[in-house]
From Swiss-Prot:
Its main location: membrane. Keywords: Membrane, Transmembrane, Transmembrane helix, Transport. The gene is DAL5. It comes from Saccharomyces cerevisiae (strain ATCC 204508 / S288c) (Baker's yeast). It comes from the Eukaryota. This is Allantoate permease. Coiled coil: none annotated.
Amino acid sequence: MSADASTNSNASLDEKNLNITSEAEIKNEDVTAEPVLSTVLSPNGKIVYISDKVDEAMKLAEEAKEIEVTPEEDRKLRWKIDYCMFPLMCILYAVQFMDKISTSSAAVMGLRTDLKMHGDQYSWVTSAFYFGYLFMNLGPVQFIFQRTSHMSKMLAVFIVIWGMLLALHAAPTVKYPSFIVLRVLLGCAESVVTPCFTIITAQYWKTEEQFTRVSIWFGMNGLGSILINAIAYGVYIHQDSYAIKGWRTLFVITGVITIFIGILIFLWIPDDPSKARFLSKREKLMVVQRIRSNQQGFGNHEIKKYQIIEALKDVRTWLYFLFTVSSNIPNGGISSFMSILLNSDFGYSSKETLLMGLPTGAVELVGCPLFGILAVYAANKKIPFWKYKLSWAIFAAVLALIASCMLGFATNSKKARLAGAYLWYISPVSFICVLSNISANSSGYSKKWTVSSINLVAYAAANLAGPQTFIAKQAPKYHGAKVAMVVCYAVMIVLLSILLIVNLRENKRRDKIAAERGFPEETENLEFSDLTDFENPNFRYTL
């Protein structure tokens, strides 16, 4: 290549503000075979080619660019989205948790006796659910839901199916083997809710709003716990009035409720903001404008292999994975065995156990949203350390560690152990923070789905293993399970601290690079180009 050609090449690149000094650097990049709309320089110094396979929000981006949204309009739109989307989302999340832990209440209502369970067989009832959950998140969930343009409709179908499966738990012909099969299938059906909700949250709310929203809908697990204990108590005290056993009646009731909620989801929740019947044309454009700062849009229905590979190479993916394993081994055990602990370890009767389970849900229902609100307040006030959401996750993990120690080692005080059991229900705050991190910090639709799926594989595997820490021969104290909880929460604190440091350092590095590059001409609608967080120079990680 001649010197003149080299000079011309460099000049053309400088005109694009790419800060590339030689044509060789372009040749080192993998140029896509797809039509190239534009190029951008990633934070790692690589040229990124933007193809025509962009985010769904790009269809509205040009039109949205022309409108101006006042702070008052933005506030009203946010409240409208909250009002129209959130109640049904919260109810569904409460119902899915109610269904998931229904076996815990059924266990003290005669389930174990009627199905002739012995030894560790009850532990496998819970683990079976997570075998199905694990299988679906190994790939099927991502393939089905990323490829479809009707995400909420597909979600509704899965909800109705799991409602039917739950009602089938009550069939008089169900024995232990068939009950296990039903639990596996139920896990398959329920596995879709959390990843779908993570995507929906990113579609409608800004990154700074997402932690509070995830805290609220995930905190509805507490409402689900209250509902299942209340329904179970009502069934238990009137069980002589039914033609079938009380625990079978419980599954029929919860199954019918779930089917009804699935129908409502199908009729009301839109597939993405552009299809929301409760939003006017202008409001749909306003949604596009308000999520520009997220550096991501509604999603892309093509599965991009390079984004999957990037997700596998991202250290955050594996920090999420290890954290989720650590946080959900205790969760898998306590969710299934809390009623049994109250009954056998604390000495409450079956009737008292169902009542004593109510406060556990109240702690989670109030505590999780409260942490989300406090985190937003601290961020707005820029309070050192506490302005980071991950700081609140670390604090919640410390509380969970204290609660586990109280539950496991306060052997001389029943009240202290009971207080620890209740305080433990604040522990989901840490997991909520990680879910909101995945929603906000994993950019690129295929990458987001991949990271979410890997995280939920860890969730399923840990919840599958959790009940196995409750060894039958250690009943009623289950000392080994309590020690495992303490170890897991100690590991969680370390992992969350590492995640915070990694994101802080990367944001500082990107700020430094941006300052050195100056202010190049902005690539139009870059945030809706379906770029990953590794590719987008404007992306900063939520802390």
